[in-house]
A protein has these predicted regions:
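Conserved catalytic loops of nucleotide-sugar-dependent glycosyltransferases that act on lipid-linked
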Residues: 1-55
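Terminal low-complexity segments of carbohydrate-biosynthetic enzymes
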Residues: 50-190
């Protein structure tokens, strides 16, 4: 157990350990579970989840954990239409992303990020894969900080592009498929 395996980081910590232990992991549809609004907490939530992910991956890579993780295709959960997030709240995330980007040195070589940029699913998966290459070379928190502005801009692009639950579900499925293909490619070519 590491410091980030509590709070928001617990789900990813347990899931990665289960996957590396060869256990079958599946998502259970909860139906119409109503979540408390969390858009305003997304930055601290992301920091904890991402740091927990990178910390756990680093631990698992250096342990004797089983590494034949199967990323078999699973269907994205059907998203439930929620209250739309206001344009002002989305614009605030974009402003925060630009502020964090300007004040956080990046760990990866990439294109500059500007407030007019759209972080598409393709660019997002590329950013994720580039950050995977620095696991073990710097702190997990530092990796999470480096990826945070890209995540916020991905959220902004996602919200701008998807105005209903079906479109949002399709976007998540396409992004997941792309990430699995890229992960499998990286695993066999590096």
């Amino acid at each position: 157990w590491h410091d980030y395996a509590y709070g928001y980081g617990i789900d990813i910590f347990l899931t990665l350990h289960d996957l590396c232990s060869g256990l079958k992991v599946t998502e259970i549809p909860l139906g119409k579970k109503v979540h408390k609004p969390s858009f305003n907490k997304m930055i601290p939530m992301f920091r904890e989840v991402a740091t927990s992910y990178y910390e756990t991956v680093q631990e698992l890579l250096t342990s004797k954990a089983k590494h034949n993780i199967s990323l078999d295709q699973v269907d994205a959960p059907v998203l439930i239409q929620a209250e739309p997030i206001s344009a002002d709240a989305i614009a605030e995330r974009k402003f925060e992303a630009m502020n964090i980007y300007a004040n956080t040195p990046s760990l990866i070589d990439t294109i500059p990020l500007s407030s007019s940029d759209r972080v598409t699913k393709e660019l997002w998966v590329d950013i994720l894969m580039r950050h995977e290459h620095v696991v073990g070379q710097t702190s997990s928190y530092r990796i999470a900080e480096s990826i945070l502005p890209w995540y916020l801009m991905r959220v902004v692009t996602y919200l701008d592009d998807n105005d209903n639950a079906k479109a949002a579900t399709d976007e998540i499925q396409q992004q997941s498929d792309l990430a699995v293909r890229q992960w499998n490619y990286e695993a066999t070519h590096h």
